[in-house]
Amino acid sequence: MSKAFLLWWIQVVTVLFAAILIFTYGWFEKLWDSDQTKISFIIITIFIATSIATGFLSFRSDTQYIKLSNYIWFASETMVTLGLIGTVAGFLLMLSSAFDNLDVSNVENVQKVISNMALGMSTALCTTLSGLVGSVLTKVQMVILENNTKYE
């Protein structure tokens, strides 16, 4: 086993431990409820796929797999882009229905508007956070791989 694979494995175990904690505290359910676009789960799926591919690359460091690393770097940037798309979508959700039929004299109506705005804002923030975290973790894996693997 190579040093790159062992370092990859340490990161995977750490991420799995964090995922178990997140699942235990019910944060996945909160993410599911907060993200109306579900882009966060697309980002999580991309992260899992790139982590598996990075582990494969770190286990078998042949020159024929160098092209695959370019796709992983691209996927890392795609996670950030999807996070930003989710941010825009969340703000659009927040502003699209925020002021329709707003009657400031009716307290219940104002509470409903604020609730709708909070839902759009939570979508925006959840997708941004998912995209940034997924991208950073993928980039860390790739830097470890490239610094500890010798392609002949």
Which residues are covered by each model-predicted region?
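Hydrophobic alpha-helical transmembrane segments of small proteolipidic membrane proteins, enriched
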Residues: 1-152
